Amino acid sequence: MADVERLILASRVRVEITDPRDIDARYCLRSYFEELGRRFDTGFDPAQSISASDEEMTLPNGLLVIANLLGAPVGCGALKFHFDTQIAEVKRMWVASDVRGLGLGRRVLERLSAEAVSRGMASLRLETNRSLSEARYLYERAGFVEVEPFNNEPYAHHWFQKDLGHKY
C-alpha cells in the first residue's frame, strides 16, 4: 500500500519554470546550498563556485524549474544556455530529502532536457561532487556519460555530458 501512496503522491508534483527571485525558488536554492554545505567534505561556499546567478537562470539566458507538491516547493533544477556552442549547463539540481525516491529528480531532469531541446541545445553538461552518489546514479541512468573536466569548478569531481540527439 505504501508504494501506491508514494506513486499517487509523486503524480501530484508539478514541475514548472519559475523566476529565481520567487519565494519558492529562494527556498529551494537556499536548501540546496545548505545541503551541499553539510555533505561536501570541505563545506560549500557559493562565492567559490561557478556562478548560476538569477540573471543566468532567467530567460533568455537560462531558466529555473521548481518541483511543487501540494503547494510546497520540494525540488529544483536550472539551465544556463550557451547558444554559441549549443550546450546547456544543468545547475542547482536538488530534491528535498523527505520526498527522495519518488522520481522527482528524474522528472526535473526530464523537464530541463525538454526545455534545452526546445531552445536548440545539442547537449547538456553538468558537474557534481563525489559525495553526491545518488546524483551520479541519476545522471548515468538518464543517459549522461562521464567526460573529461570541461571547467574548473572547485567542488566538482565528476563531469558529465548528454547528447540531446540533434544538431542545428
Region spans (language model):
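Conserved G/P- and acidic residue-centered "switch" motifs that form tight phosphate/ATP-binding loops
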Residues: 71, 103, 120
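Short polybasic/polar patches that bind polyanions
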Residues: 100, 117, 140
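C-terminal "cap" of GNAT-fold acetyltransferases
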Residues: 1, 7-10, 14, 20-21, ...
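Acetyl-CoA-dependent GNAT
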Residues: 10-87, 91, 96, 109-110, ...
